[in-house]
Amino acid sequence: MGSVSKTVISARGASPDDEQNGTKNGISNGSEWAKCIFLFFFLFIAGMSNWAVLAYTHDYVPRESLPDIVFSLVSEQRWASSLGDFCVALCIVMLGALLVIHQHRGTILKRVVFCAGTLYAMRSVTLAATQLPSGYTDNQGRCRDQVESEAGVFFGRLFEQTIRIGFQSKDQMLCGDLLFSGHTLVMVTCSLAVAYYLPKSIKPLQWVSHVACLIGMICMTISRTHYTIDVVIAYWLSNMVFRMYHAYCEVDMCMERRKSILYSWWPCRIVDWLEQDIVPGRLENRCQLPWRRSTPRGQERGGASAESSDSSVTMCDNITTSHHQKHVSISSSSTYPLPC
């Protein structure tokens, strides 16, 4: 067993002693802090870019709404806008509760933040590329007046959006924040995370977030906060980003990850860096309140080291741990798992 583990590490370009001595606590902590700082600024800049585009394009967006299949079937329901916001808040609360009770809350938070940042970065590009008019029946009354572009007006709007975290007054708002739906990407990402990471004993609670997400998407359309296409694209992209990230994480060996077609997609290079200290494979979904110390049972699958002071850092190079053992044979062409 020991010789196989050493062979695997040597194949990754490290000495056999790296399994025990290669990662010191200081280096690991520094790496984790670097990842946290990167993710914070990534999400912050992605969000700010959305608000900056809205602050600028509001004065150029037409006021005549476009045809939409749902708009032709259902009249504008203004009450649904508030219900949609409530559904967004409920999905966020569900995710927050999951982070409180889950043993690997730090790993989950990093993954969700990266997915959200990626989606908001995509959204800022679509907002800047194509400006759609709002779908309200009375766009002139619901949207703020259009003025000549000035730096003072732009930065004032940007500051307002920043302190409100993107939320706006329902009566006088900046218009053109449409393609694609930010409400939907938040709800879908949160509900996917809740469903994926909930421990089995409380798995049925995932339906709370799923139902809230479905109702919220319907409300976004019938309230004419978004066109149907905004919601559909947001749903597709949110699923794609979340599932591609986790499909990459579930590739059960680091060397196989590098051979995967996913690795050729440049965001997966960042994912590879974010996941380098986490044992490949699916997280073990287990409850553990943050104020309770974990028992010294060894390292758990999926990076328990980030959440427990009683275990050492689990690196991607370390193929064998007490709860996640891999028996592998390395040839010049590929790797093959052997039965344990």
UniProtKB/Swiss-Prot annotation:
Active site: H183, H226, D230
Gene name linked to the record: sms-3
Coiled-coil features, chain-numbered ranges: none
UniProt KW keywords: Lipid metabolism, Membrane, Sphingolipid metabolism, Transferase, Transmembrane, Transmembrane helix
Record-annotated membrane-spanning stretches: 36-56, 81-101, 178-198, 202-222
Signal peptide stretch: none
One GO BP annotation of this record: sphingomyelin biosynthetic process
Disulfide bridges in this chain: none
Entry EC no(s): 2.7.8.27
Stretch list, region Disordered: 1-25, 294-313
Function: Bidirectional lipid cholinephosphotransferase capable of converting phosphatidylcholine (PC) and ceramide to sphingomyelin (SM) and diacylglycerol (DAG) and vice versa. Direction is dependent on the relative concentrations of DAG and ceramide as phosphocholine acceptors. Directly and specifically recognizes the choline head group on the substrate. Also requires two fatty chains on the choline-P donor molecule in order to be recognized efficiently as a substrate. Does not function strictly as a SM synthase.
Ranges of the Cytoplasmic topological domain: 223-340
Cross-referenced InterPro entries: Sphingomyelin_synth-like (IPR045221), Sphingomyelin_synth-like_dom (IPR025749)
Protein name per Swiss-Prot or TrEMBL: Putative phosphatidylcholine:ceramide cholinephosphotransferase 3
Taxonomic classification: Eukaryota, Metazoa, Ecdysozoa, Nematoda, Chromadorea
Organism whose genome encodes this protein: Caenorhabditis elegans
GO-annotated molecular function: ceramide cholinephosphotransferase activity; sphingomyelin synthase activity
Bilayer topology annotation: Multi-pass membrane protein
A Gene Ontology term for the protein's cellular component: Golgi membrane
Known catalytic reactions: an N-acyl-sphingoid base + a 1,2-diacyl-sn-glycero-3-phosphocholine = an N-(acyl)-sphingosylphosphocholine + a 1,2-diacyl-sn-glycerol; an N-acylsphing-4-enine + a 1,2-diacyl-sn-glycero-3-phosphocholine = a sphingomyelin + a 1,2-diacyl-sn-glycerol; an N-acyl-15-methylhexadecasphing-4-enine + a 1,2-diacyl-sn-glycero-3-phosphocholine = an N-acyl-15-methylhexadecasphing-4-enine-1-phosphocholine + a 1,2-diacyl-sn-glycerol
